[in-house]
Amino acid sequence: MENVFGNKLVSARKMAGMSLQDLENKLEKVVSRQALHKYEQGKMKPDSQVLLALSNVLHVPVDYFYSVPAVKIELKNIDYRKYSSKISKTEQLSVEEKAKENCERYLELEHLINPNEKSEYFVYDKIIETADDAENAAKKLREVWSLGYDPIPGVVEMLEDKGYKVIELDAPDGFDGMKADVDGKRIIVLKKSVKQGEDVVRKRLTALHELAHHSLQFSKKIPEKEIEKLCHTFSSAVLYPADMAKKELSKDRFHFYQNELMLIKERWGISFSAVFARALHLGIITSFIYKRFNIGYRERKLHLNEPGKFMSKEKPVKMQRLVYMGLSKEILTINEAAYYLGMSAWKFKEQLHQIV
């Protein structure tokens, strides 16, 4: 017989980033570490007082411990943004467990509402060894997805339209993004925006960086650090295509002005620093000028609060759309809809406004 409660307790504890000892401490002697271990092993069951305490400390509803997902998954080929994602092993496990929980709900919902969902994943067959190879891959993506030379209004929306499962999580400050595979489906995990009006250019670049890890094949001779740089080249080239960058930036320049960079950022949704890197790669500036730009950028503390704003929400909405479709067709109840969106039924009812 499956140990449902024990497995869900382990999952909730990992999502909270707690060890058994941490959980015992948070429960303030309501139950011992040894008893918690027995709960997880399925050798003991908690009483109602302990169950409520676990629910409060782990921030999950009591029902969570007894819900059995219809779709059970295993995240495979997990890959983080190395050299930029600086999180501990415990935080990493927490992120992965949250991603797994979200994926289970997402895929279960999709199976109920839209089981014949088609995907248009980008696949690039050539081996990537150089920055020019990454540039060519970006050109190919724009061609295959019929993007032309126009700015991309919403990167996250574009990826969702192509069938990628984009998930946002509450995650530690050191986390940028990760990718994973689930039964042939491609998952992209991003950090949830916490501030109203937060600058989205970094999230756009991160989403495309994870797309690069999904889509590109790198030479085995290349070290991981170089692969990360090539992913960055690809994502920047998708955002700001070479022909347009060369036309707008012009060659042999010695200066960049903040006003000009703001115009580029607000049109293309790309950060100042990524524009500098594009200019260097495309031969518009020399490495000496590039170094000067970066020094000036940091001296003015622009990396802390970069001016200019790209007007896009960059939030995944596919799961919400599936929920509302399920409600409108009476496939889902209010309680089920709330479960799939990971919120309480009363909170969901509060924000639900039926027109007809």
Question: What does each model-identified segment do?
Answer:
Residues 1-356:
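Active-site hotspot residues in diverse enzymes, especially metal/ion-binding acidic/histidine motifs
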